[in-house]
């Protein structure tokens, strides 16, 4: 495994650790999710470029589209929770149930 792959894997693990440790605020959780998606995007792109898989060349773009949708939904939920309750605590999401 090359040094580039190791660095991207370390970035993914650090983002995952941040997501698991700092779960109190929604904004920090969203930033950690974006870090995970970015490192996953770079890893998939480099893997496809190194293996010359032409059939899977659309995979990074599809992953990027899903990351953008996840970010948009997360920010919409963050705005809704912060407007309703005034804080962005993740524990307030339990109050949104019908």
From Swiss-Prot:
It is a multi-pass membrane protein. GO terms for cellular component: mitochondrial inner membrane; respiratory chain complex I. It is an enzyme of class 7 (translocase). GO terms for biological process: ATP synthesis coupled electron transport. Its EC number is 7.1.1.2. Its main location: mitochondrion. GO terms for molecular function: NADH dehydrogenase (ubiquinone) activity. Disulfide bonds: none annotated. It is found in: Mitochondrion inner membrane. Keywords: Electron transport, Membrane, Mitochondrion, Mitochondrion inner membrane, NAD, Respiratory chain, Translocase, Transmembrane, Transmembrane helix, Transport, Ubiquinone. It holds the Pfam family Oxidored_q2. Signal peptide: none annotated. It catalyses: a ubiquinone + NADH + 5 H(+)(in) = a ubiquinol + NAD(+) + 4 H(+)(out). The chain crosses the membrane at residues 1-21, 29-49, 61-81. Core subunit of respiratory chain NADH dehydrogenase (Complex I) which is composed of 45 different subunits. Core subunit of the mitochondrial membrane respiratory chain NADH dehydrogenase (Complex I) which catalyzes electron transfer from NADH through the respiratory chain, using ubiquinone as an electron acceptor. Part of the enzyme membrane arm which is embedded in the lipid bilayer and involved in proton translocation. Belongs to the complex I subunit 4L family. This is NADH-ubiquinone oxidoreductase chain 4L. It comes from Mystacina tuberculata. The lineage of its organism: Eukaryota, Metazoa, Chordata, Craniata, Vertebrata.
């Amino acid at each position: 495994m090359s040094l580039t792959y190791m660095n991207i894997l370390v970035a993914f693990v650090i983002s995952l650790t941040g997501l698991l440790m700092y779960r109190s605020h929604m904004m920090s959780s969203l930033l950690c999710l974006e870090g995970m998606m970015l490192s996953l995007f770079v890893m998939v792109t480099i893997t496809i470029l190194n293996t010359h898989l032409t059939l899977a060349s659309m995979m990074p773009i599809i992953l990027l589209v899903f990351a953008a949708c996840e970010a948009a939904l997360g920010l919409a939920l963050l705005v809704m929770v912060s407007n309703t309750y005034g804080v962005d605590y993740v524990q307030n999401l339990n109050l949104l149930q019908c």
